[in-house]
Swiss-Prot record:
ATP binds at G114, T115, H116, G117, K118, T119, T120. One of its GO terms (biological process) is cell division. Its EC number is 6.3.2.8. It catalyses: UDP-N-acetyl-alpha-D-muramate + L-alanine + ATP = UDP-N-acetyl-alpha-D-muramoyl-L-alanine + ADP + phosphate + H(+). Pfam families: Mur_ligase, Mur_ligase_C, Mur_ligase_M. One of its GO terms (cellular component) is cytoplasm. It is found in: Cytoplasm. This is UDP-N-acetylmuramate--L-alanine ligase. The gene is murC. It comes from Rhizobium etli (strain ATCC 51251 / DSM 11541 / JCM 21823 / NBRC 15573 / CFN 42).
Length: 471
């Protein structure tokens, strides 16, 4: 049974969230009546309003109006007045993943999972499918620069979605193709232990129907181990690993471009296909790996090598994924969402390969619990940065944990041998501290999932202002 047209007005609590906004937009484009509420008048909220979706700022029971269905994310607390009112009215309350699953039933679906790289990989798969004329519908966890949004309504039979594993609800998604980029011990507050995370990703792949397939990264030990345990589903492996079915090789980094070859081997027939001199306008082996996952999907769906190369070369990137926000005095300033040690290490390694000068990393740790559980990993992930500026922890609603803060992390980084790690006590001091260390040819990379993105946007003009004062 499919989602009927006459479901009435759908109300989203927290509609401005990156996942919720995409689902709301696609529902609206399908002709359903959609409205919602959010705590702030964010860019996502403004974008939805421009499309004709009514959005209330603040959560109040009366916002429900004539709603027949209410959609919530796991971030919405049971004490939310709109949620309480919905239950008093006996309205169906639908989890975000459940509504996404309903949308996926309209299409053949590709779900992109993994601890890191999901958003970029989702964007790359969408780009290659579009280049191949498949006109996909897309719901992503980040703003795709080519679309200016995280959602796209296509006319084709394929849908590409980012599968969020944080609360386990990604297992509800009816995917025909399941991609796993990597598996790390994240979200243990939900899963309890790493074995439960492993089990969830195994189920994610085994949930695909017999006519579907999994695409799995052979470079990641946890994923490689999982490949060996899946017996009854078709699996395509990818990576730099010589044993991968879809392998990238001959990598060259040219500024902020990556140039590489891909070899595709069909295990059953022995057939080989070479894609030579592929160009992607993003640096870094982690991004090449994500592109190779997208190539594996596109190739299996019958997209030509020529269209794959064309799509890859035209890829416009994802907002907050090594996004250039401006330049000052020959210094380039980048904004990145990286907030886990694995992500930070990969971004800084990519910056090191692309930059002719020095790397200045500015990081705002996100959540005390994450910093506490991964403290030693954070202390070791900045080695590719010549200078490190660490801002206070962005709490995201958490209580502080004694002894777990940015000053402690600075001390640990320095005791581990790093030559230049400093505490950045406030955003107001950032321009002066950057101006003190940055020279022409350097990269300044701001990393984090909190408010640091606004610092990255403001920094180029702030630095210009400092130059004006000194003149």
């Amino acid at each position: 049974m499919k989602l009927p047209k006459a479901i009435g007005l759908v109300h989203f609590i927290g509609i401005g969230g990156i996942g919720m906004s995409g689902i709301a937009e696609v529902l609206h484009n399908l002709g359903h009546k959609v409205q919602g509420s959010d705590q702030s008048d964010s860019a996502n909220v403004q974008r939805l309003r421009e499309k004709g979706i009514e959005v209330f700022v603040g959560h109040r029971a009366e916002n429900l109006g004539d709603a027949e269905v209410v959609v919530v994310s796991t971030a919405i607390r049971k004490s939310n007045p709109e949620l309480i009112a919905a239950r008093e009215k006996l309205l169906p309350v639908v989890r975000r993943a459940e509504m996404l699953a309903e949308l996926m039933r309209f299409r053949n679906a590709i779900a992109i999972g993994g601890t890191h790289g999901k958003t970029t990989t989702t964007s790359l798969v969408a780009t290659l499918l579009e280049a191949g004329g498949l006109d996909p519908t897309v719901i992503n966890g980040g703003i795709i620069n080519a679309y200016g949004t995280n959602a796209r309504m296509g006319e084709g039979e394929w849908m590409v979605v980012e599968a969020d594993e944080s609360d386990g609800t990604f297992l509800k998604l009816p995917a025909d193709v399941a991609v796993i980029t990597n598996i790390d011990p994240e979200h243990l507050d939900h899963y309890g232990n790493f074995d439960a995370v492993r089990a969830a990703f195994r189920q994610f792949v085994e949930n695909v129907p017999f006519y579907g397939f999994g695409v799995m990264c052979l470079d990641h030990p946890e994923v490689q181990s999982l490949v060996g345990r899946i017996e009854d589903r078709k699996i395509i492996t990818y990576g730099e690993n010589p044993q991968a079915d879809v392998r990238f090789k001959n990598v060259r980094i040219d500024g902020t471009r990556s140039i590489f070859d891909v070899e595709i081997r069909r295990r059953r027939t022995g057939q080989r296909t070479e894609l030579k001199g592929l160009v992607m306008p993003m640096p870094g082996r982690h991004n090449i790996s994500n592109a190779t996952a997208a190539i594996a999907v596109a190739n299996r769906l019958g997209i030509s090598s020529e269209d794959i190369a064309k799509g890859l070369a035209s890829f416009g990137g994802v907002k907050r994924r090594f996004t250039l926000t401006g330049e000052w005095n020959g210094v380039q300033i980048f904004d990145d969402y990286g907030h886990h040690p694995v992500e930070i290490k990969a971004v800084l390694k990519a910056a090191r390969e692309a930059c002719k000068g020095r790397i200045i990393a500015v990081h705002q740790p996100h959540r005390y619990t994450r910093l506490a559980s991964l403290f030693e990993e954070f202390a070791a992930c900045f080695n590719d940065a010549d200078s490190i500026l660490l801002a206070p922890v962005y709490a995201a609603g958490e209580d502080a944990i004694e002894g777990v803060d940015s000053t402690s992390l600075v001390s640990r980084i320095k005791s581990g041998g790093h030559r230049d790690a400093r505490f950045l006590s406030s955003a107001e001091l950032l321009p002066e501290m950057v101006a003190e260390v940055a020279k022409p040819g350097d990269f300044v990379v701001l990393l984090g999932a909190g408010s640091i993105t606004s610092w990255a946007a403001a920094l180029p003009k702030q630095l210009e202002g400092l130059s004006g004062k000194s003149a």
